[in-house]
């Protein structure tokens, strides 16, 4: 029987938040409400070290400076996005500290949290398959499938669900390389998560996934060449088989040809021109305010269209000051990811994929991005890899 004490309760609340970070079709989500309610308790009981204060400063200082400067110079006030930014920045550092604190309580806490994400990813994909099979794209007021036949799951956008499934897919893909135990189960998990990524029909998510998979393949090619060769050949065979089946299939979902829809996603879309034009306006914002930018959440005030590029959005809204501090943060997290040893190379692979994804989609407000950041920083400081003696 589990003995309930303060530490145990905090541990299960962390797992609960992780689960609900994959169910975000309404805002604030259950996880958001949980974090906000517990924030006063976290502030009182959680102790920050120099690393946490430094990370928070790199995020909060340019955000607050640009917010006040945007109001003083342009009259822009966007409290909503400032609060969202601050919430996610606090989530990042508190999640990191909580992981540090629970290392002795659960030496496999990364696995525990990833299995939690895997469970909610399965829920998303299974619900999507149910929608495809029954034609019920809307379940209890939530569009599970939309934008044609793109899988949204319990997210608000397939471009967010796809990258979330990528992290889970990379986790189980690394399991595929790590041992001969439960190999069939690992292949099934990988195939199912890959199906979720594919059905999102997000081109950025596909590129994200490819970059992450390639990184893991290269890492394990140096770790165990014999295992690498046959498992990589098996992977290539399965992927080629899947693609051939897709090309020659003639499935129709809700009157839409699956094959034709897939082909359509491979080309340049009409709205891509709007995206490129919007991205070019980031230079206009820099011209308006080079140092501090125009303020968080104000990009659309100038363009009337989302940036679809996290780096250009950050630069336009926070100026060169934000670009420098943001660059330092990304560089720090990347260096920590490259220090990872042991059995969690998927974290570095996920980071690479997310950084690639960020060039094509606004990722700043993705909860799973900040949780991955927290996992990387926390795990990379461990003297002994989680779950290894």
How does the language model describe each region?
Residues 1-47, 61-73, 127, 354:
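N-terminal signal-anchor transmembrane segment
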Residues 15-18, 34-47, 167-178, 320-340, ...:
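Hydrophobic, aromatic-rich transmembrane alpha-helices
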Residues 111-142, 153-223, 328-332, 336-339, ...:
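Alpha-helical transmembrane segments of multi-pass inner-membrane proteins
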Residues 138-140, 263-318:
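Long extracytoplasmic/lumenal interhelical loops at the membrane interface
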Residues 220-266, 283-288:
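A membrane-periplasm/extracellular boundary helix in multi-pass inner-membrane enzymes
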């Amino acid at each position: 029987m589990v003995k309930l004490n303060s530490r145990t309760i905090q541990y299960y609340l962390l797992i609960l938040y992780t689960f609900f970070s994959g169910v975000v079709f309404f805002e604030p989500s259950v996880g958001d409400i949980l974090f906000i309610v517990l924030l006063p308790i976290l502030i009182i009981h959680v102790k920050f070290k120099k690393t946490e204060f430094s990370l928070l400063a790199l995020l909060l200082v340019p955000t607050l400076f640009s917010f006040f400067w945007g109001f003083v110079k342009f009259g822009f006030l966007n409290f909503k996005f400032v609060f969202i930014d601050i919430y996610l920045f606090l989530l990042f550092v508190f999640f990191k500290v909580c992981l540090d604190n629970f290392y002795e309580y659960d030496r496999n806490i990364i696995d525990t949290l990833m299995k939690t994400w895997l469970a909610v990813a399965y829920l998303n994909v299974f619900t999507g398959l149910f929608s495809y099979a029954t034609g019920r794209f809307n379940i209890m007021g939530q569009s599970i499938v939309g934008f044609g036949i793109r899988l949204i799951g319990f997210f608000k956008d397939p471009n967010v669900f796809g990258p979330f499934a990528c992290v889970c897919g990379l986790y189980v893909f690394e399991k595929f390389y790590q041992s001969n135990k439960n190999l069939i189960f690992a292949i099934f998990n990988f195939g199912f998560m890959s199906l979720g990524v594919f059905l999102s029909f997000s081109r950025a998510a596909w590129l994200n996934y490819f970059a992450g998979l390639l990184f893991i393949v290269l890492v394990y090619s140096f770790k165990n060449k014999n295992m690498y060769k046959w498992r990589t050949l098996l992977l290539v065979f399965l992927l080629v088989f899947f693609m051939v089946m897709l090309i020659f299939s003639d499935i129709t979902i809700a009157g839409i040809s699956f094959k034709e829809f897939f082909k359509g996603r491979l080309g340049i879309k009409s709205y891509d021109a709007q995206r490129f034009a919007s991205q070019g306006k980031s230079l206009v914002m820099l011209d308006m305010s080079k140092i501090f930018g125009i303020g968080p959440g104000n990009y659309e005030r100038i363009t009337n269209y989302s940036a679809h590029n996290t780096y250009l959005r950050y630069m336009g809204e926070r100026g060169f000051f934000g670009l420098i501090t943001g660059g330092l943060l990304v560089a720090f997290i990347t260096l920590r990811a490259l220090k990872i040893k042991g059995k969690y190379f998927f974290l570095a692979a996920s980071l690479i994929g997310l950084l690639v994804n960020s060039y094509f989609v606004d990722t700043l407000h993705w909860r799973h991005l900040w949780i991955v950041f927290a996992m990387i920083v926390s795990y990379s400081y461990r003297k002994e890899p989680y779950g290894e003696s």
